Amino acid sequence: MFHLQGPQLLQMLEKSLRKSLPESLKVYGTVFHMNQGNPFNLKALVDKWPDFKTVVIRPQEQEMADDFDHYTNTYQIYSKDLNNCQESLATSDVINWKQHLQIQSSQSSLNEVVQNLAATKFVKVEHTQCILYVMPETARKLLPSLPETKNLPVGYGAPKAINQEMFKLSSMDPTHAALVNKFWHFGGNERSQRFIERCIRAFPTFCLLGPEGTPASWSLMDQTGEIRMGATLPEYRGHGLISHMLAVHTRALDQLGIPVYNHTDKANKIVQKVSHNLHHIAIPHGWNQWNCEPL
């Protein structure tokens, strides 16, 4: 595959991916941040240029030194042609199947491609599918033709009021990574904690400090520009903190011109209710992640 290098080509890629939203969302969000300084030192590969059919975003080889670190060994894929995608990935060394890795996409149709490739590479695959939400201002800007966008009310959804005497708005610090790691569904280990620290250093974060002066609720961003890892300490749940956090984080990113989206588990009815109240739009085909391990 062809490695796109230099700001001009990456900006052209971003513009082209924008025409394929929402299916290209995970890759579009990643390329957007590659064009804003590329804090995760990622690279973009295409099957051909400029009339590409398949795009793969991945870390530089030197970043992927730990074969068991699937948080770092993460690939984002978008394809206009699934046969082309399978052929491009099968006949190249773009994906290092000897490592523990993750593939992410906002195309559920990639499942067959990933499963077929994994079978030939002797790799075990676990597919996780979640609800993928786009925030209202991002939908108005990037997805104006969606019926749900046309029905959006003016302005932002109102978050639940919080006790602003008790909870103070702040930003996360890398020293808070252990706390985030403890409550992150996909975390709980040393590698995930290092990934969280990197996200805190690289992207805008928000938290509400509780009476003790430590985070009671928080939300972060990952290398694809997605709001992730949000949580509230058990003793402060039920006070509307995560709703407030999402609203504040979203508004701040909107003002910076950053596309805003997030995902939640299909079983997480609380976050789904929050998203509904804040007028988030669920995207077809959802959020997809394939965790791959060599057999």
Curated annotation (Swiss-Prot):
Pfam families: Gly_acyl_tr_C, Gly_acyl_tr_N. It catalyses: phenylacetyl-CoA + glycine = phenylacetylglycine + CoA + H(+). Its EC number is 2.3.1.192. GO terms for cellular component: mitochondrion. Its main location: mitochondrion. The modification N6-acetyllysine is found at residues 43, 48, 80, 182. It comes from the Eukaryota. The modification N6-succinyllysine is found at residues 48, 182. The keyword Acyltransferase applies. It is an enzyme of class 2 (transferase). InterPro entries: Acyl_CoA_acyltransferase, Glycine_N-acyltransferase, Glycine_N-acyltransferase_C, Glycine_N-acyltransferase_N. It comes from Bos taurus. It is found in: Mitochondrion. Coiled coil: none annotated. One of its GO terms (molecular function) is phenylacetyl-coenzyme A:glycine N-acyltransferase activity. Gene3D superfamilies: 3.40.630.30. Keywords: Acetylation, Acyltransferase, Mitochondrion, Transferase. Belongs to the glycine N-acyltransferase family. This is Glycine N-phenylacetyltransferase. SUPFAM superfamilies: Acyl-CoA N-acyltransferases (Nat) (SSF55729). Mitochondrial acyltransferase which transfers the acyl group to the N-terminus of glycine. Can conjugate a multitude of substrates to form a variety of N-acylglycines. Catalyzes the conjugation of arylacetic acids with glycine but does not have activity towards any alkyl-CoA.
